[in-house]
Amino acid sequence: MQDLIRASLVIALLSGCTASPMLKYSLDVPAQTMSVLDAPEVQDGRARFREIFCSTLHEHPDRKRRGCDELLHRLRDEAPSAPQPGPPPAPDHRLRLVFVTGLFNDCASTVALPFETAVAHLRSLGYSAEILSVSGRSSSSYNAASIAEIVSQAPDGDQRLVLVGYSKGAVDILEFMVAYPDLAKRVSAVVSVAGAINGSPVADVAAPFYQRSLKDVSLPGCGPGDGGALASLARPARLNWLVTNRLPNARYFSLVSFTRPDTVSSPLRPFAAALAEIDPRNDGQLLFYDQVIPGATLLGYVNADHWAVAVPIEEKRPVLATLVTGHNWFPRDMLAEAIALYLSEQLAAEQDTR
């Protein structure tokens, strides 16, 4: 009888009959990813990226608002910072950084586009940078064609093309890399920022409703596309795609975002709470271990939610940021600069070893 009672208690616990999520928010864990069998090994670039990001932050006018160690999470297994950080890399102005937008971003383009202010900042530093606003309501295969068109127009020469994908934009880039292998050879590096690499449980729940009720509904600022955006982000779709598709040779880098539940933007809080039933280390759209490209170099864990890491609502629409979203401040321009500097160093080192 006692064994039956114990078994019933265990079943009740595992069935979700708890007052709060079983996992607690904590940084006392190592870096981790979830991927498919035989996936390429992820490399750890956190220590050097932290050095570069912290050095760029010294140039930010609001650097005292939050310290560098508060902006980048330090998980249990990250190597301690060196007493004397290495010298900052020399910027490689041959880089051409193309930032690919994510889910529904074109629908909100009048508010702000991902890395909109960062692109202007990078240009002021001498880099070539631009935003590719893909169809926010379309499937990743649909948007891969748009990326292919941009890449096909890239001039020959010593320019180094870097594709930076935010959220679903990262997935669109990966589909491009596989579907257009000849064009993919022109890409020097791929960077995911809060990339939906493994998909999201949020999409698993929302995709059927969207397909039934919203797929063909007109929305301001964006056409319906092929209607497959959320279906592309479902976890079965993404994980099965990773099983059947090997990424071509290129350098891959991933920057992950997550933050505490109380620092999530207000509209994202219901999603963050739902995801916390799986793991509280999420950004309001994605779990932290779902954001790393197989075989990528892990750059770090940004202490920001899914919008704050990339979308400059505070800069572009300060009233909206204050009254509606909240918690949107983040030095995105410095983050983009640190990415460019890190790539400058890494791609130069790769060239030297050839």
Give the residues covered by each predicted segment.
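Glycine-rich His-Gly loop
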Residues: 100-103, 167, 195, 257
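Active-site catalytic motif of lipid deacylating hydrolases and related acyltransferases
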Residues: 88-161
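Flexible, membrane-associating and regulatory peripheral segments of lipid-active enzymes
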Residues: 17-110, 353-354
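Sec-dependent signal peptide recognition
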Residues: 2-10
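C-terminal catalytic-base region of ester-bond hydrolases, centering on the histidine
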Residues: 24, 36, 43, 248-354
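Short aromatic-enriched loop/helix-cap "lid" or pocket-rim segments at secondary-structure transitions
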Residues: 111, 200-206, 263-268
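Serine-dependent carboxylesterase/thioesterase catalytic core
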Residues: 145-244
